[in-house]
């Protein structure tokens, strides 16, 4: 870090003046949902790892992930700062931890998607809310912690370019006594932000409306570092980007570089980009094992109401064919609970999944997330504001055409039909024996136990 620019000299000077290093506790809370969330292998929390990477230069850091079995202490006397990351699903738990630490006189920081979207609510449970990404407010925040003069909200006036992004230090997660609970897929980030601004999405608020990206060489260097650490080429990566293909030229150049490394990877990709056969060819050649695709609905009226122009129903089968041709599995997302949904929506979805042999279908109920335009539109119809149930699996409001009872009846029936043994064999026959098979049989067991009451 340069000692001649902006606030950095003050930060370095303050750090040098400290007689001892302040102690930080970083917390990843678990959720309280009854559904299959935060169970089994969980992804390493990249955002919290980034906080640890930044903070460890000036402070002593303890890293706890409650999802893996780490215990959050009742007594915070050993720490000066307690920093908690939160999304809507674990917000109540994050608030409980924050309240406890705040009552003990600690500096409490709460950041993440939910506190960014509902800053006033989150501010009741902490000293300071980190609005959006911490990287863009880090110097200001660290200086204030040294001085002991905190602001109620830290919000960047300008987001930093990703060219200055510090590579994440995964040792904070990997050195945990419960590290075996983490998925073998290593989270990686190449881009941030999205200018599209869909009414149901939080990305533009959290990461900005401009599309930012890291230099390709830096992304590849991070992959090489993991290959060296693990002593093998076929390291598996999961891109955390919301819209990595927004700039096709950048994405294609990144894949060309990855093809030379021999890695394996998966990502969320926009539907319209996958219509091009050359994209699937390069994705397969660069080691793509699975694409996560938001099909959302087989109802054209619903797609139109979502303003999701990237989804063209007439191209769905071509997209699937392109990926399957290059042995890329599909994690397909389907949402139910729209006002225009009918029983025909479920049948059309079942037919599409079975005919196109979608390897890993994921079904959710329409959930208006707080802070989004869609939430404001639906607020008067939402059944409750119990954040523990905002997991996209609980019934949030009654759709006009179908009604709540029929919605849940058909939702459960569809899951059972898609994940019954014979359906799994039809969809998966001849495909590689890997974790996708395992997940299908886990879902077979899970869906047999479903009842409407679980979704209320």
Curated annotation (Swiss-Prot):
Its EC number is 2.1.1.331. It is an enzyme of class 2 (transferase). CDD domains: Radical_SAM. GO terms for molecular function: 4 iron, 4 sulfur cluster binding; metal ion binding; methyltransferase activity. Keywords: 4Fe-4S, Bacteriochlorophyll biosynthesis, Chlorophyll biosynthesis, Cytoplasm, Iron, Iron-sulfur, Metal-binding, Methyltransferase, S-adenosyl-L-methionine, Transferase. It is found in: Cytoplasm. Binds 1 [4Fe-4S] cluster. The cluster is coordinated with 3 cysteines and an exchangeable S-adenosyl-L-methionine. It holds the Pfam family Radical_SAM. It catalyses: 8-ethyl-12-methyl-3-vinylbacteriochlorophyllide d + S-adenosyl-L-methionine = 8,12-diethyl-3-vinylbacteriochlorophyllide d + S-adenosyl-L-homocysteine + H(+). Residues 178-405 form the Radical SAM core domain. [4Fe-4S] cluster binds at residues 194, 198, 201. GO terms for biological process: light-independent bacteriochlorophyll biosynthetic process; methylation. Pathway: Porphyrin-containing compound metabolism; bacteriochlorophyll biosynthesis (light-independent). InterPro entries: Bacteriochlorophyll_C12_MT, Elp3/MiaA/NifB-like_rSAM, Methyltransferase_Class_B, rSAM, rSAM_horseshoe, Tetrapyrrole_Bchl_Biosynth_MTs. Its cofactor is [4Fe-4S] cluster. Belongs to the radical SAM superfamily. Involved in the biosynthesis of the major light-harvesting pigment bacteriochlorophyll c (BChlc), which confers a significant competitive advantage to green sulfur bacteria living at limiting red and near-infrared light intensities. PANTHER family: ANAEROBIC MAGNESIUM-PROTOPORPHYRIN IX MONOMETHYL ESTER CYCLASE-RELATED, BLL1977 PROTEIN. This is Bacteriochlorophyllide d C-12(1)-methyltransferase.
């Amino acid at each position: 870090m340069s000692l001649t620019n902006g606030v950095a000299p003050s930060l370095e000077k303050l750090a040098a003046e400290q007689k001892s290093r302040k102690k930080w506790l970083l917390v990843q809370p678990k959720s309280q949902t009854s559904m299959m969330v935060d169970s089994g292998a969980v992804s390493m929390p990249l955002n919290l790892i980034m906080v640890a990477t930044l903070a460890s230069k000036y402070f002593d850091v303890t890293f706890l992930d409650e999802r893996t079995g780490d215990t959050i202490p009742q007594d915070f006397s050993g720490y000066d700062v307690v920093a908690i990351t939160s999304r809507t699903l674990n917000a109540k738990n994050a608030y409980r931890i924050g309240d406890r630490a705040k009552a003990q006189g600690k500096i409490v920081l709460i950041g993440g998607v939910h506190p960014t979207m509902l800053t006033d609510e989150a501010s009741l449970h902490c000293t300071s809310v980190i609005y959006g990404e911490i990287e863009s407010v880090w110097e200001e925040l660290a200086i204030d912690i040294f001085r002991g003069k905190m602001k109620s909200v830290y919000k960047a006036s300008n987001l930093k370019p990703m060219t200055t992004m510090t590579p994440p230090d995964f040792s904070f997660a990997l050195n945990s006594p419960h590290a075996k609970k983490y998925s073998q897929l290593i989270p990686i980030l190449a881009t941030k932000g999205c200018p599209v601004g869909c009414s149901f999405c939080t990305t533009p608020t959290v990461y900005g409306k401009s599309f930012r990206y890291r230099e390709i060489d830096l992304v590849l260097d991070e992959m090489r570092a993991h290959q060296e650490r693990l002593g093998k080429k076929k390291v598996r990566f999961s891109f955390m980007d919301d819209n990595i293909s927004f700039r096709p030229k950048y994405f294609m150049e990144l894949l060309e570089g990855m093809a030379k490394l021999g890695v394996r990877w998966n990502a969320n990709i926009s539907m319209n980009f996958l219509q091009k056969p050359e994209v699937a060819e390069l994705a397969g050649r660069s080691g793509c094992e699975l694409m996560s695709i938001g099909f959302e609905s087989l109802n054209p009226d619903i797609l139109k109401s979502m303003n999701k122009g990237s989804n063209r129903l007439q191209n769905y089968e071509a997209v699937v064919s392109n990926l399957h041709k290059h042995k890329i599995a599909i994690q397909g997302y389907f949402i139910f609970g729209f006002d225009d949904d009918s029983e025909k929506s479920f049948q059309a979805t079942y037919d599409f999944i079975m005919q196109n042999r979608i390897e890993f279908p994921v079904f959710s109920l329409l959930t208006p997330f707080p802070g989004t335009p869609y939430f404001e539109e639906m607020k008067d119809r939402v059944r409750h504001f119990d954040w523990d149930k905002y997991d996209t699996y609980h019934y949030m409001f009654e759709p006009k055409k179908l009604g709540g009872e029929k919605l849940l009846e058909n939702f459960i029936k569809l899951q059972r039909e898609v994940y019954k043994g014979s359906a799994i064999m039809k969809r998966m026959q001849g495909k590689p024996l890997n974790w996708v098979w395992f997940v299908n049989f886990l879902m077979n067991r899970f869906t047999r136990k479903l009842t409407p009451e679980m979704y209320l």
